């Protein structure tokens, strides 16, 4: 079987959960309030970056064990997990673009558009709990296969 280490994945899933809990504080903020608070913009940008990075780390760990030697872009890694039915193909397609926002936040490729980041808050709060559930289901499947 694979040498996937559940503890690596579980640790990152817990981090995603903690980050999502903090991001929920911004769930009902108005766009005007968000745009007028540089501090809130920085906090949400960082939380979105951390959520996405933890998912990327999970994806990389799983794929490195399933397809040793093959490398994927962060976007492709989400799609690949959909092909393996670890994520539903629908979720994989929906969530994969979040890796692009993460790259913009980390590397500041372009000016960061606070309107885009604002919209990403509700997206992350909807999609990443699904990601966590589907990865947890995959871990349960692995555990059952190893019993």
Curated annotation (Swiss-Prot):
State which Enzyme Commission number(s) the record gives.
Answer: 3.1.27.-
Q: Where is this motif: Y-loop?
A: 107-113
Q: Any miscellaneous information on file?
A: Part of a locus that includes subtype I-D CRISPR-Cas genes.
Subunit composition? Homodimer. Forms a complex with MntA, probably MntA(1):HepT(2) in vivo; can only be purified when both Arg-102 and Tyr-109 (or His-107 and Tyr-109) of this protein have been mutated. The fully di-AMPylated homodimer is not found in a complex with MntA.
What the record says about family reads:
Belongs to the HepT RNase toxin family.
What would changing residue 46 to E do, according to UniProt? No longer dimerizes
Q: Which InterPro entries does the record cross-reference, listed alphabetically?
A: HepT-like, HepT-like_sf, Type_VII_TA_RNase
Provide a Gene Ontology MF annotation, just one. Answer: endonuclease activity
Q: Which reaction does it catalyse?
A: (tRNA)-3'-end (ribonucleoside 5'-phosphate)-(guanosyl 5'-phosphate)-(cytosyl 5'-phosphate)-(cytosyl 5'-phosphate)-(adenosine 5'-phosphate) + H2O = GpCpCpA + tRNA 3'-end (ribonucleotide 3'-phosphate) + H(+)
A Pfam family this chain is assigned to: HepT-like
Task: List the ranges annotated as motif RX(4)HXY motif.
Answer: 102-109
Task: Provide the protein name.
Answer: tRNA nuclease HepT
Q: Could you list this entry's UniProt keywords, alphabetically sorted.
A: Endonuclease, Hydrolase, Nuclease, Nucleotide-binding, Phosphoprotein, Toxin-antitoxin system
- Residues where O-di-AMP-tyrosine is found: 109
According to its UniProt entry, the function of this protein is described as: Toxic component of a type VII toxin-antitoxin (TA) system. Upon cloning in E.coli inhibits cell growth for several hours; eventually cells recover and start growing. Cleaves the last 4 nucleotides from the tRNA acceptor stem (shown in vitro with E.coli tRNA-Glu(UUC)); only cleaves intact tRNA. Has no activity on mRNA. Neutralized by coexpression with cognate antitoxin MntA, which is due to di-AMPylation of the RNase.
- Determine if Phosphoprotein is one of this entry's keywords: yes
Can you tell me which residues the record assigns to a coiled coil? none
Q: Which GO terms describe its cellular component?
A: toxin-antitoxin complex
């Amino acid at each position: 079987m694979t040498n996937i280490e559940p503890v690596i994945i579980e640790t990152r899933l817990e981090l995603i959960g903690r980050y999502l809990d903090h991001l929920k504080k911004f769930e009902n903020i108005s766009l005007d309030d968000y745009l007028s608070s540089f501090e809130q913009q920085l906090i949400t940008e960082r939380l979105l970056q951390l959520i996405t990075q933890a998912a990327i780390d999970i994806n990389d760990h799983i794929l490195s064990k399933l397809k040793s030697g093959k490398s994927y872009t962060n976007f492709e890694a989400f799609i690949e997990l959909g092909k393996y039915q670890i994520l539903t193909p629908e979720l994989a397609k929906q969530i994969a673009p979040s890796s692009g926002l993460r790259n913009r936040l980390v590397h500041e490729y372009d000016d960061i558009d606070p309107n885009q980041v604002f919209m990403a808050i509700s997206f992350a709060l909807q999609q990443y709990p699904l990601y966590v559930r589907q990865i947890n289901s995959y871990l349960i499947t692995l555990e059952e296969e190893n019993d």
